[in-house]
Every structure is written in C-alpha cells, then in structure tokens.
From Swiss-Prot:
Species name: Geobacter sulfurreducens (strain ATCC 51573 / DSM 12127 / PCA)
Gene Ontology MF annotations: aspartic-type endopeptidase activity; endopeptidase activity
Name of this protein: Lipoprotein signal peptidase
Active site, UniProt feature: 119, 137
Name of encoding gene: lspA
Family annotation (PANTHER family): LIPOPROTEIN SIGNAL PEPTIDASE
Length: 160
C-alpha cells in the first residue's frame, strides 16, 4: 500500500472514531443544553444539537437534511478523487484531505442517524461566544489549514 494511502486511512479512522466516540459520550452522559465549565470564562462542554451547518446556517431550510446529505456525499467524492491524484510524497496533503474527509463523514453520519449534528465544544470570551462545534468540525478546519500549508509548499517547490 502506498504511503499516502496508509496516512489517509489511519487519519480517517482515528479522527472518525474520536468524533463519533465523543458524540456518543456526550449524548449518553449529558442532558441537552447542559454545560460543564472546563476553563472558567473560556471553554465549556455544552451539549447542543445543530440542524444547520456552521453558525446554524440553513437550520430552518425545509429541505436542509437532503441538501446537507447531498452536499456531504459530493464533498466526499471530490475529496476521494483529489486524494487519488496525489503524488506518493504528498504526505501532508494526504493527512489534510483525510481530516476534511473524516470531518465531513462524521457530520454526515450524525445527519443520517439523528437528522442533526451533535455539537459540544463551546469556546467563549466574556460575552462573545463562538458557535459550538465538534471534533468533525475541528478536523475539517485543521485539514483546510494543512492543505493551505501544503499548497504553499508545493508552489515553493515548483519555483525556480
């Protein structure tokens, strides 16, 4: 198996297991809207359900569930095709795409299973609250950042 495939599979498996395990743990041990302060004034574990996307985008859209499922499936396909085009030495890009893939898949599993996504990571400062998120959302963000770093590295590699 090519190194990029080993990286991709390991990152997808690890990230997806962590995402789903934390969501099951939150769902089984906390009441909806319950909040547990972790770092006072900065971070709490707060059990929420999100019917929309980031920032509850399209939460009230009547066809939101089929729309988000379709978008997720298309995104997974695009990521898979993009991954297959990587060179054997593009380890960072493989890990980045794996994080994005696992994040999209983790939230897709929630949407299919529950009709919404479990969010629980609650970051805030004084009166400012960042919208709650989960491990899958974090994986997507980290993956996108790593992909940007890889693209910059690739451009520098190509430069004379």
């Amino acid at each position: 198996m090519k190194p990029t495939y080993r990286i991709f599979n390991a990152v997808v498996l690890g990230s997806l297991v962590l995402d789903q395990a934390t969501k099951v743990l939150i769902d089984r041990t906390m009441d909806l809207y319950q909040s547990i302060p972790v770092i006072d004034g900065l971070f709490s574990i707060t059990y929420l359900r999100n019917r929309g996307a980031a920032f509850s985008f399209l939460a009230d859209f009547s066809y939101r569930l089929p729309f988000f499922i379709l978008v997720s499936v298309v995104a997974l396909g695009v990521i898979a095709v993009t991954f297959r085009k990587l060179r054997d030495d593009q380890h960072l890009a493989a890990a980045a795409l794996a994080l994005i893939f696992s994040g999209a898949l983790g939230n897709l599993i929630d949407r299919v299973r529950l009709g919404e996504v479990i969010d629980f990571l609650d970051v805030y400062w004084k009166t400012y609250h960042w919208p709650a998120f989960n491990v899958a959302d974090s994986a997507i963000c980290v993956g996108v950042a790593l992909l940007a770093v890889d693209m910059i590295r690739e451009e520098r590699r190509k430069a004379p």
